[in-house]
């Protein structure tokens, strides 16, 4: 696994090892009238076995600009949750920007005292940039999401509804400067119109709808979305529209790639973005 990360030039110096194995999941693809099914097997895995205090965050944050965290980590165990919030507190003190992916997975919150809604809301309160799909935002904020009912790329987003929705979210998360929502309508197992909306400093941004048909593999599409957005922000920080356009193009490409990782590079994403 470490060699795979290094293959893409990622710095693995601060990765620690633990547990008996890597976590796994089993995914049954949707087809026709049958929904997809995901089974997580994380017992005795590295994250599951993480103990509070195992990670020394100070040297990690010394040269960091952004700390990106996931709700999935908080779902693994009480120790993983406490470790996450230790990191958030130190990142804030050291001036490291905090971004988060809500990443709500209901099948993971099993440890005694686990409270997904309260924990995710607290995680979001630390963040200057928050990403999630419609349902995840509803879990984290308890605000009913706006239905996305696109049947093709001609669908029009209700600007006023999203402006009001983002204003309500901003009251709950006053530190957050950018809020990004992934919108997907699963018409059929292999037909998903996809887009995203962004609120940045109180301004609404929209982008094109990709009418993806056929979908090859939807796993990891939201990860590709947020990764592309963070990459774009680091490169074009003064152009929120370009960042959103790049992010949704990155997510759209992932729908055409088998597996849960997107291997698309910047040039390939820009090519799709400019179509």
Protein language model features and the residues they cover:
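Conserved N-terminal subdomain of the carbohydrate kinase-like
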Residues: 1-72, 269-275
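Charged helix-capping and loop-helix junction motifs
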Residues: 54, 81-86, 112-121
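Conserved post-catalytic alpha-helical subdomain immediately downstream of the catalytic base
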Residues: 189, 204-275
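Short beta-strand/loop segments at the ligand-binding rim of alpha/beta enzyme cores
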Residues: 94-99, 103, 108
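Hydrophobic beta-strand scaffold residues
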Residues: 12, 98-100, 131
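Active-site beta-loop-alpha junctions enriched in small/polar residues
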Residues: 43, 72, 103-107, 135, ...
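Conserved phosphate/ATP/ADP-binding segment of small-molecule kinases
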Residues: 108-203
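A short helix->loop->beta-strand "cap" motif at the edges of active sites that frequently abuts
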Residues: 90-97, 173-177
């Amino acid at each position: 696994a470490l060699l795979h990360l290094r293959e893409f030039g990622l710095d693995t110096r601060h990765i620690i090892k633990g547990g008996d194995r890597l976590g796994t999941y089993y995914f049954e693809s949707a087809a026709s009238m049958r929904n997809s099914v995901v089974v997580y097997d994380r017992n005795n895995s590295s994250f599951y076995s993480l103990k509070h205090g195992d990670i020394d965050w100070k040297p990690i944050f010394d040269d960091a600009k952004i700390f990106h965290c996931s709700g999935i980590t908080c779902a693994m165990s009480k120790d993983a949750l406490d470790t996450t919030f230790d990191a958030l507190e130190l990142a804030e003190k050291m001036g490291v920007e905090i971004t988060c992916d809500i990443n709500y997975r209901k099948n993971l919150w099993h440890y005694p005292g686990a409270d997904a809604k309260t924990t995710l809301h607290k995680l979001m309160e630390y963040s200057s940039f928050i990403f999630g799909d419609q349902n995840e935002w509803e879990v984290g904020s308890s605000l009913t999401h706006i239905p996305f009912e696109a049947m093709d790329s001609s669908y029009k987003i209700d600007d006023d509804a999203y402006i009001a929705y983002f204003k309500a979210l901003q009251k709950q998360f006053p530190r957050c400067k950018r809020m990004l929502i992934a919108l997907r309508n699963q018409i059929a197992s292999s037909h998903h119109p996809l887009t995203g909306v962004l609120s940045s400093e109180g301004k609404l941004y929209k982008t094109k709808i990709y009418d993806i048909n056929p979908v090859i593999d939807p796993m990891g599409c939201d990860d590709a979305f947020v990764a592309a957005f963070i990459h774009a922000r680091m490169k074009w920080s003064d152009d929120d529209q370009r960042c959103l356009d790049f992010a949704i193009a990155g997510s759209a490409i992932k729908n055409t790639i088998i597996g849960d990782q997107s291997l698309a590079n910047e040039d390939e994403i820009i090519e799709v973005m400019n179509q």
